[in-house]
Amino acid sequence: MREPRVALESAVLTHGLPYPLNLEVALALEEAVREEGATPKTIALVRGEVRVGLSPEEMEALAAGGAEKASLWNLAALLAQGRSAGTTVAATVHLAHLHGIPVFATGGIGGVHPEPYDESADLVALSRTPILVVSSGPKAILDLRATLERLETLGVSVVGYRTDRLPAFFSPDSPFPVPARVDTPMEAARVYLRARALGLGGVLLVNPVSQGLPYEQVALWVEEAGRMAAREGVFGKALTPYLLRKLSELSSGETDRVNRRLLLENARLAARVALALAGLE
C-alpha cells in the first residue's frame, strides 16, 4: 500500500489568520492528519523553492509575516525571483498534483464574487487537475449560486459528504443542492478513482462544519461587510482578507472559531479518504 499523504495549503499560515494563531492552527492541522494515520505535506514557496512538507523553522518564518501569496498567475515569477510565499488553493492543487499527492484539505475554496465580477483561479485549477479536495464549500463571502454554476460548467465533480446541500463555509447548510452524496471515506475514494479513470478533473468533497453558524445570519454579515468594502474601495486580491476580517469583527470572533474547527475537521476527513484511497490503489 502506498503512503497516504494529504496536501495542506500555506496561505492560511501566511495570510489567513493573525500570528501566532496562524502557526498554532497550521501545526494542529498537521497533527490532525497524523492522528488519522496519514502524512501531512504543507506546501509553500521558501526562498524560491517549492517545499512539499515544511520544517518547524520554515513554518515559523512564514507565519511571522512578510511572505507573498502564490496563485497560478504569479507562481513562476515568485520562484524565479527567489521569494517565499504561502500557496492558495489553486497553487496548492497544482503543486500537490505535480508531486503525486491526490488528496488536499482546505477550509473553503475561492469562487465567484457577486459585485464587481471576480472569479477565483481555484475553479479552473480544480477543473483541470485530477485531485480530491476536501473543503467546507466555497467561502461565505461568495455568490454560492454562481460558484456552483461555474463548477458545473467546468466539469468539477461536486460531492456532498453526508449532506445533500452545499455547505457555505461557516454554515453547514445552504439553499443549494449538490449533485451527488457519499457517506464514507471509501465511497469518496471510489468516486475519485472513477473520475480519474474517465479523464475528468478534480473532485470537490464538501464537508459541512459541525456547530456552524446559521446561513441567514452569515448572509447578513456578508452583506454589511460588502457595503464597507465598496465604501472603502477595496477590490482584487485585497477583497477576500478584508471581508473575512470584517466578518470576524461583526461576529465578535465567532467566524474565526468556526474557521479553525472546519479546517481541523476537513484535515481529518482528508486523511481518512487518503487512507481509503491508498488501500484501493
From Swiss-Prot:
EC class: lyase
Reaction(s) catalysed (UniProt annotation): D-ribose 5-phosphate + uracil = psi-UMP + H2O
Protein source organism: Thermus thermophilus (strain ATCC BAA-163 / DSM 7039 / HB27)
UniProt binding sites for Mn(2+): D118
Enzyme Commission (EC) number: 4.2.1.70
Similarity comment text for this entry: Belongs to the pseudouridine-5'-phosphate glycosidase family.
Lineage top rank: taxon: Bacteria
Gene Ontology terms, MF aspect: hydrolase activity, acting on glycosyl bonds; metal ion binding; pseudouridylate synthase activity
Alphabetical keyword list: Glycosidase, Hydrolase, Lyase, Manganese, Metal-binding
Coiled-coil portions: none
Name of the protein in question: Pseudouridine-5'-phosphate glycosidase
Keyword Hydrolase: yes
Cofactor: Mn(2+)
Catalytic residues in the record: E9 (proton donor), K139 (nucleophile)
Hydrolase as UniProt keyword: yes
InterPro entries in the record: Indigdn_synthA-like, PsuG
Single biological process term from Gene Ontology: nucleobase catabolic process
Binding site for substrate: K69, V89, S120, A121, D122
Quaternary organization: Homotrimer.
